[in-house]
Amino acid sequence: MKQILNILPMFIFFIFYKFYDIFIASGSLIVISGLICIIHWIFYNEIDKISLFSFLSVFFFGSLTIFFHNSQFIKWKITIIYIIFSLVLLISQFFTRKPMIQRFLEKDIKISNIYWRKINFIWSLFFLFCAILNIYIAYYFSETIWVNFKVFGFTSLTFFLILITSIYINCKISKNK
């Protein structure tokens, strides 16, 4: 349920963009992101850090988009989020005992620290790649193409890397048995 709540804003944004425009879609994104934080609080008695960070960034960049009537702000939001994710993973890679990915998944998955570090580094590079790709698409293609790619392209890329990561982890778990 939490995962569905976390991807819902992107699809609400897409629907409102298709029926209205980027400014109405940005407003809907702010509202649904806020509602998701409230739902997390009501059902789970907490707002996880990713949902809160997502809401705050959506609120900030979405408000700037609406206030200045300039879609560049909402386009930069995802780039900045991807850069932050990349940096957090990279910093955890080199300056902490456990990489961030390991902290999220180690309760459910038991593999060696070296494999966690490889996975963490790959995801860090992935987020950096997505940040650069977002800038490229935002500036060299139409707004409609950018919205479609934001929703379907990045989602597909993310699911693909999740699949590859899962296969890699499964291979490492099998070797450890």
UniProtKB/Swiss-Prot annotation:
Primary localization class, coarse: membrane
Pfam families: IspA
Organism whose genome encodes this protein: Buchnera aphidicola subsp. Acyrthosiphon pisum (strain APS)
Role this protein plays: Plays a role in cell envelope biogenesis, maintenance of cell envelope integrity and membrane homeostasis.
Gene (name only): yciB
Keyword hit for Cell inner membrane: yes
Keywords: Cell inner membrane, Cell membrane, Membrane, Transmembrane, Transmembrane helix
InterPro entries the UniProt entry points to: YciB (IPR006008)
UniProt name for this protein: Inner membrane-spanning protein YciB
Family, as annotated: Belongs to the YciB family.
GO cellular component terms listed in the entry, alphabetical order: plasma membrane
